[in-house]
Structures are given as C-alpha cells and as structure tokens.
Amino acid sequence: MNQDTICAIATAQGGAIGSIRVSGPEAITITGRIFTPAKSGKLLSEQKPYTLTFGRIYNGEEMIDEVLVSLFRAPHSYTGEDSTEITCHGSSYILQQVMQLLIKNGCRMAQPGEYTQRAFLNGKMDLSQAEAVADLIASSSAATHRLALSQMRGGFSKELTTLREKLLNFTSMIELELDFSEEDVEFADRSALRRLADEIEEVIARLANSFSVGNVIKNGVPVAIIGETNAGKSTLLNVLLNEDKAIVSDIHGTTRDVIEDTVNIGGITFRFIDTAGIRETSDTIESLGIERTFQKLDQAEIVLWMIDSADAISQLTLLSDKILPRCEHKQLILVFNKVELINETQKNELASQFSEHIGSEIESIFISAKQRLHTDELQQRLVAAAHLPTVTQNDVIVTNVRHYEALTRALDAIHRVQEGLDANISGDFLSQDIRECIFHLSDIAGEVTNDMVLQNIFAHFCIGK
C-alpha cells in the first residue's frame, strides 16, 4: 500500500469556509510544521484525538490564516490512517497557500477518490460501501439519498455477507463429502442442500430484480416528449426544467436532435427527452433526428404525446398506427397543448373524439406550455405515473450496474447448482458452481476485484473524497 501522506481541498470554491484534508503516516507531523496552536502551548501531535484546536497557519514568519484543525488517529478515521482536517476561510488564495505549504513539507496532492480508496484498502468499508459514497455525493432526490445512505451504512454488504456464509457452509458440506468419497458416506443431505440453494437463489434474484427500480431512481425516470413538429415539445421541456434548454421557434423542424436533462419533481428524478418532431421529410439530418425520436420512445418509461389542440384530429392516424403499438407497456399521457386556441366546446369534442378512437383508458390533459396553464397538474400526473415505491434507509435496492452484472452471474451459477442437485451430479461439479457464485458475490464487495477495476471506480470521485 502507498505510504505517501496526501492532501486535498475538500470543499467547493466560493464558500465562506474551506476545508483541507490530510491523510497518511506523516499527516499530523506535516500539519504540525505549519500550524501553531493559539493557547494550549502543546504541539499538534500532543493534542487529544477527535478534538478541534484553534490556531494559526504560518509560512515562516508570515501568518496565512486563523484556522481550526481536527485530529484523528489511526485506525479511527475515515481513511483508517492518521488524519487532520484544516478548516480555514474560503478564500482561494488562502486555500492554495495552505496546500503549497503542505506539499512543501512532504505531502503530495491526492488523486481523485484516493481518500475513499484508502478507506477501502484499510478495511474501513467494502467496495460497495465505497461506491455508495460517490452515489451519496451525487444524490439529487430524497430516494437516491436514502438508497445511497443505506448502502453506505452496510445494508447491502450485510445481505452479501449472509449469502456468502450460507454458500460457504454449502460448499464445505459438499467438499467434506468428497474427502470421504471412498467411505461411501453422505455428509450432505441432498434435499437439505436443495432447500438451501433455493433460499440463496431467492435472495440473489430479489436483489438482481431490484435493479430495475434502483436504476430508475438513480438515473431518473425516462420521459420522452413526442409529437409532430411545432406541437410545443421544446416549450414544454423548458417549462419542466424551468430554464431555456431548447430552442423554440415557429419554424417546423427546429429540433433535429435529442435534448435531455433531469429535474426533481415531487422527490422523484425525471429525465426528460425532447425529440425531433415527427413528419414526412426529405431532409437527411431531420430524418436521422426522427429515427432517434422513435429510439428514445422505445427506451422511455413514460411518453408524453404532444398534440396541437388547434390541429388535433389530423394526428389521430399517426397516434393509432405508429405510437400506440410502441406504448403497450408504457405510461402514455396525451398532452393537448395550446389550449388557449380553442374554446370549451371544442375541447370537449376533442376529448370525446380521441376517447372514442383510441379508448378512454389512456390518460389525457389540456395545457398551454407557453402560458404555463395546467403544467403543475401535468407534473402531478408524472409523479403518479412513475409508480416508484417509497424508499426508506432500511431498503436494499441495487442501483449500480456493476453490482447488477455480478448478481446476474451469481444467479446463473446458483441455477446450475439447482439443476445439478436435481440431476444428482457429482459433488465436485457442484462445488465448482458454488465457488463461482461466491466469487461473483465477493467481487461486489471488492474482495476479488483487480486493480484496473478499482482505479476506474475511484477515478469517478472528486479530488477531496
């Protein structure tokens, strides 16, 4: 393990307060070289751990700032190493001066994610918990925050530990039987092993299946805004995002490519996708945009079909022939836009005609994106259509693609064990599949993960974490 002492700014620029983290075998010594306690007369190394000490940072005779230094001794720190945290004023000049002094006295600049990587390598957390730290930092909704917190606190890790213990018990019984194969003694009751395999399979399957919900919670519910040209799709996107993300124009075919962005509505992250308007065109670029429109439609969980209320009937054929067949397993909401251009009688007639033509079970709403009429109600409809479960900090839901892939491979291995037990195959073949299952579960926790995978994971962290 690298024994360098590292330092990094842990706070964003522009705040009133700044924080610098120092970790490694010389963290306390190096910090003590530039820090002078204000009152106690004790050196920093003589201070009690888990305390704050007020004092000053000096560059020779020149005072840089008045600061607070917190002291942590190994192994009782975030990284498991001796650590200090210097809290100073948030001036970028002050922060850079302190960093230069630390580096001059023996620190080196930390790499992205190096603090959390050291915590993992020092056994302070497993790899799934380390990844949860990054998820917690990136959390943008109550649900993503709760899931990241649950995983960081070890909820997922406990499930994995329990599974591995059961699998190790399983394989030990099988291998004990192999050791005494010449004695014709059966140590492992096959029916009991089948019940244990079923129990393990049920837990792994539950965790793997939870990814469909976890992925949506983490990355946002994909909502495709679809419709003919000039139906008001880009205007609606700007209203939902509360910013001018998309260009709005009366010219048909203005949007030629997909525009995506996320926003939190009612505690749920939605990923809105504005698409090119659907129409017959000879323009090659616009045609490619329309192809992408249908690709995004297929990927969406919720589809908003935007309709120009003043020209709605002409869209019935397109809706029936091309849109409805693709939305069989999706939440489709018909959004009649530009409602200010029609009267109440016309509005009722439109609702009746569409209901008669495509069925009354499809949800619809009349809005004016330009005038922001009933857009709040549309947001409420989106929250209801998301159908996401209420998430608590005790829930174990998989949100990480790497974890999902490992669980899928573990599930395949345990399925082979079940099939092998049913076929009464030799214990040595069963043992191979059990060990493969253990391997994939251990990979999630980082017990068998190679260095390249670790570097890729921690490279996505910020410098100060």
From Swiss-Prot:
GO CC field: cytosol
Main location: cytoplasm
CDD domains: trmE (cd04164), TrmE_N (cd14858)
Record's keyword terms, sorted: Cytoplasm, GTP-binding, Hydrolase, Magnesium, Metal-binding, Nucleotide-binding, Potassium, tRNA processing
Chain residues that bind K(+): N230, S249, I251, T254
Any single biological process term in GO: tRNA wobble uridine modification
An MF annotation (GO) of this entry: GTPase activity
Cofactor dependency: K(+)
Enzyme Commission number: 3.6.-.-
InterPro entries, sorted: G_TrmE (IPR031168), GTP-bd (IPR006073), GTP-bd_TrmE_N (IPR018948), GTPase_MnmE (IPR004520), MnmE_dom2 (IPR027368), MnmE_helical (IPR025867), P-loop_NTPase (IPR027417), Small_GTP-bd (IPR005225)
Record-annotated membrane-spanning stretches: none
Domain TrmE-type G: 220-387
Protein name in the entry: tRNA modification GTPase MnmE
